[in-house]
């Protein structure tokens, strides 16, 4: 996971997620599925199909569902897949919940027909 050009970026991403989750006191992480694009991407090993092998292996190991998106390009990086695989505690939201906060993150790559953003909700289950 930590080889190649993005090694430092990946380490910073993983550490940043850990710090944020700790600061917010997050105990459960719900991820129903990850939306993934299609096509190929150039990487250190040449032209590689999307999802790239690391994402395939991580999602398979973590039983993470991938939902095809009508987008040409990589939406799920190996670092993102590793974070979800390591931290997800459930694939289902509570039957009833209240939204306490919303956070958005945006990538740098432009995609046609896709915002390239990630939305996270901080929720509390309703009794």
For each of these PLM feature ranges, what is it?
Residues 2-25:
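Conserved phosphate/anionic-ligand binding catalytic regions in large, soluble enzymes, centered on
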Residues 26-126:
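Mobile "lid/hinge" segments at catalytic clefts and subdomain interfaces of large enzymes
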